[in-house]
Structure formats: structure tokens, C-alpha cells
């Protein structure tokens, strides 16, 4: 049996402010840092050790990984960072408050932008200061690979080749792998691993800072998956994610 652990970064400053973040490089809040520390403790106490870790090129995921590995006394393991693990690019919505956007465009439209599989939000223009082509970390990317907006399908299309070429071979060779990334890049992988439909993926909410463990067979098909931690708190954290963008959230 092979094990893979997925971890969404801890709460970021824009998670706290309920903003569409996407490729904007915001940092963790103190709560987010504590979520990362707690994830590291949970993994250590459950007996996990890792051979290699993967993360995005965005600091909220990178810092989460640093904290987790520090808690586990495993900061020495190899780490690979790739833009392909970045959060989904939210286009012109990046920086906007989700609740205010729901008031302006309607709760249903915001839900479609956030959770649908193949509908993109309004795009940035290349002269927008938020355009990632202006960021030096992407200077070696072909222009056609730099998004102006993305739907989840686009995120799947950029993530899965990296999974197949870089990550999956490590898992198949019995390496213990940790992926610290983002809500939508991890939704893309979960959709693939669990063979979820487009309708099912709309209902999937991945909370910040809680390890999701996959036990896989030799063909990397899931045997089971589960979150580490207190189940009541996990369900509450999932509901917080689900309520983002609702005009009258049921808190």
C-alpha cells in the first residue's frame, strides 16, 4: 500500500479577508501558521515520514510546507516547487471580496465561478498589473502557458502532466510523498484520483491546514482517504469554505 498526503496551505491573509486570491502571492496569517504547525504535529504523531515533498511557487504553500517539515524534523528532504501546483488563476476577480462580488453579480454566479468545472471568470488583460507575466518567477514560462484566467478544467490540464511525469513515479516507487498546495490545484488532483464527475467536484471543499491522507494500490487507485484530526472541526472547516461567497452564510 502506498501513501500520499495532500495539504492545503494554512489560512492566508486573503482567505481571512474573503478575497479571491489565485496567483496573488499573499502570506499566511498567524492562524494559518498555527494550522501548519498543527498539521506537522498531527503527521508526526501519526507516524508519518516523507521522502520528498512538492509545492507551488506561492509563499503561502511554501511557508506551510516549511513549517510542517520543521515540526516533523524533516526539513532536509528534497522539495520540488512548480507553478503547475499553483492555485487556479481567478482572472479579473483576483483581489475582490467574495461577498461583495456575490452582492454585485449574484450568489449563483459567484458559485459558478468558484466551483464549476469549465466556466472561467472574467479574464485579466496583459497590461493589468496583476498579470503574472510581469512576475520574475514566471519569466521562463512560454507566454501561452501564463493564464489570464482559469477554470478548474484548465487547472487539471496543467496539474495532471506534472502529476504523471514527476509525482506519480515517486509514489509508485514506494516513496512517501507530501504535496502542499492550494484548494483548487488539490481539487484537480482529488477529482482525478477519485474519478469524480463535474457535478461531484462542485460539492468538494478542501479546508485549509488539514492533512488529507490517501492510501493507494499499486496502480495508484485509492483504497481509502481520510483527513487527520478532530472530525467535528474538519467538518466545520469544510463548511467555512463552502460558505465563502454566500450573501447570508449559515455560520
UniProtKB/Swiss-Prot annotation:
Catalytic class of the enzyme: isomerase
Annotated residues for binding of substrate: 8-15, 21-22, 60, 87-90, 98, 114-115, 183-184
Keywords: Gluconeogenesis, Glycolysis, Isomerase
Keyword Isomerase in record: yes
Record-marked site positions (Transition state stabilizer): 182
PROSITE patterns assigned: PG_MUTASE
Catalytic activity: (2R)-2-phosphoglycerate = (2R)-3-phosphoglycerate
GO MF entries: phosphoglycerate mutase activity
Recorded metabolic or biological pathway in which this protein acts: Carbohydrate degradation; glycolysis; pyruvate from D-glyceraldehyde 3-phosphate: step 3/5
E.C. number: 5.4.2.11
Active-site feature positions: 9 (tele-phosphohistidine intermediate), 87 (proton donor/acceptor)
GO biological process: gluconeogenesis; glycolytic process
Summary of subunit composition and partner proteins: Homodimer.
Family (UniProt): Belongs to the phosphoglycerate mutase family. BPG-dependent PGAM subfamily.
Biological role: Catalyzes the interconversion of 2-phosphoglycerate and 3-phosphoglycerate.
Protein name: 2,3-bisphosphoglycerate-dependent phosphoglycerate mutase 2
